[in-house]
Regions:
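Core of compact, soluble alpha-helical bundle domains
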Residues: 1-87, 117-151
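Long amphipathic N-terminal alpha/beta scaffold segment
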Residues: 83-86, 90, 108, 113
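Elongated alpha-helical scaffolds
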Residues: 96-114
Length: 151
């Protein structure tokens, strides 16, 4: 997005710096935590891993957004839900189980939280929860038996 004022330009630059720093920390943590050994990572073919990385970047950008006004916060939560639905649809179409998809998401969310300031955690968790609900919604739509078994 384009900044309309010097203040917005500074804020955008600061946001980009925070996102870049978090992305570097996440990459280091992923290497340290040996993501390659995670069962959910092994269950996804190479093209799916590329898509997971792209989703991760979009998710990181969304989770690290400073929201300001309440209306903007609601827009962000709607966007988080839609992103979760999109991710869930793609992973289920690739044959990745709901359990593996959730484990991958929780692993990534933990990396984001470990890489950010605790003062932003409640905002990040709120958005991440909307992603999880969207993800579950998409799996449920593809396989209604998921909910009928639970009831």
């Amino acid at each position: 997005s384009f900044a309309n004022s010097p203040g917005q330009a500074r804020e955008q630059g600061r946001g980009d710096a925070i996102e870049g720093s978090a992305l570097r920390k996440i990459r280091r943590n992923l290497n340290r935590n040996d993501v390659l050994q995670q069962p959910w990572y092994q269950s996804v073919e190479e093209e799916g891993k590329v898509r997971m990385r792209l989703f991760g970047r979009r998710l990181l950008s969304l989770l690290l957004q400073e929201t300001g006004p309440r209306r903007r916060r609601q827009e962000l939560l709607v966007e988080a839900h839609l992103l979760g639905r999109e991710y869930g649809t793609e992973m289920s179409e690739r044959g990745v189980t709901l359990k593996d998809t959730i484990e991958a998401f929780v692993f990534f969310r933990t990396m984001v939280l470990d890489s950010t300031n605790p003062s932003s955690w409640s905002r990040i968790i709120e958005a991440a929860d909307r992603v999880l609900v969207g993800l579950a919604d998409s799996y449920e739509e593809r396989d209604p038996a998921i909910t009928t078994l639970a009831s």
